[in-house]
UniProtKB/Swiss-Prot annotation:
EC id: 2.7.11.32, 2.7.4.27
Taxonomy, superkingdom: Bacteria
Keyword tags: Kinase, Nucleotide-binding, Serine/threonine-protein kinase, Transferase
Kinase recorded as keyword: yes
UniProt family annotation: Belongs to the pyruvate, phosphate/water dikinase regulatory protein family. PDRP subfamily.
Enzymatic class: transferase
The name this protein goes by in its record: Putative pyruvate, phosphate dikinase regulatory protein 2
Catalysed conversion reaction: N(tele)-phospho-L-histidyl/L-threonyl-[pyruvate, phosphate dikinase] + ADP = N(tele)-phospho-L-histidyl/O-phospho-L-threonyl-[pyruvate, phosphate dikinase] + AMP + H(+); N(tele)-phospho-L-histidyl/O-phospho-L-threonyl-[pyruvate, phosphate dikinase] + phosphate + H(+) = N(tele)-phospho-L-histidyl/L-threonyl-[pyruvate, phosphate dikinase] + diphosphate
Keyword Cell division included in the entry's annotation: no
Matches recorded under Pfam families: Kinase-PPPase (PF03618)
Record: residues binding ADP: 151-158
Length: 271
């Protein structure tokens, strides 16, 4: 079977059209269904479209396009019809429906989805921060963090940090373990940005036993031992008292619930 040629034509970078095309292609056997992408980004003139049409004719290609400027879209449709080419307009039909539903004309500006604003960059910075300072890797992150989470192992510190990072908060988490003295800086930072994650002994015991099973280990390991858990929680409570920070009981809460509680505490304390 010959390679299917797919032209990606766009008045922006063409990412949207290519993602849709690749999603469709993924539904077919890659060994049997060979394909080739031909990219034509930043189409600005009718001459650019003429080139796309010429290549589509010469190579018997399918045109997958995203054009938001009405004059360019109309010209593309006209040339496709005249040349009887195979094509798909990725955005046009939905844009038409939305125009009617909103009773408002679209901006018709290429690349708007890629205009990265301050909020976007802030979120990316927060995500990178959460990865860099996960699990107390570097105490230098403590004064830079918007939120500092502390808790014993298996209190969802890492996933909670990532969830909050996607809401643009710079979060560092610090594990509390009896054998490891917390960094001095933890007691020097503003306690209002520190949140302690408390969990019941019973819940922690169940979670840790389940974790050991997943790892193919017996549940009698010290990690899930009741005496050990009591020791860890006692040490955790001592650290919390020393810091004087807010506490959230995560025993029966989903990540989303805990995140909302954290945000509410942080925002109320910043007022």
């Amino acid at each position: 079977m010959e390679n299917i040629k797919i032209i990606i034509a766009s008045d922006s970078i063409g990412e949207t059209a290519e993602l849709v095309a690749r999603a469709c292609i993924s539904q077919f056997n890659p060994k049997e269904c060979k394909h080739e992408f031909l990219r034509y980004p930043y189409i600005e003139t009718k001459e650019d479209i003429d080139e796309v049409i010429q290549v589509a004719n010469d190579r018997n290609a399918i045109i997958v396009y995203t054009l938001v400027k009405p004059e360019m879209k109309t010209y593309m449709e006209s040339k496709i019809g005249t040349n009887k080419l195979r094509s798909i307009d990725i955005m046009g039909p939905l844009m038409g429906y939305l125009k009617d539903a909103f009773e408002e004309n679209p901006y018709n500006q290429p690349g708007r989805v890629h205009r990265l604003d301050d909020a976007y960059f802030k979120k990316i910075d927060a995500i990178e921060f959460a990865v860099k300072y996960d699990d107390g890797k570097d105490p230098k992150g403590l004064p830079k963090a918007d939120i500092v989470l502390i808790g014993v192992s298996r209190t969802s510190k890492t996933p909670l940090s990532q969830y909050l990072a996607h809401k643009s908060y710079k979060v560092m988490n610090v594990p509390i373990v009896p054998e490891v003295t917390p960094p001095d800086m933890l007691f020097d930072i503003d306690s209002s940005k520190c949140i302690a994650l408390r969990i019941s002994e019973e819940k922690l015991n169940r979670i840790r036993k389940q974790r050991l099973k997943q790892l193919g280990l017996g549940d009698s390991a010290r990690y899930a031992n009741e005496i050990r858990i009591k020791e860890e929680i006692k040490y955790f409570e001592d650290i919390v008292d020393r810091i004087g920070c807010a506490v959230i009981d995560v025993s029966d809460k989903a990540i989303e619930e805990t995140a909302n509680d954290v945000i509410n505490i942080i925002e109320s304390q910043s007022k």
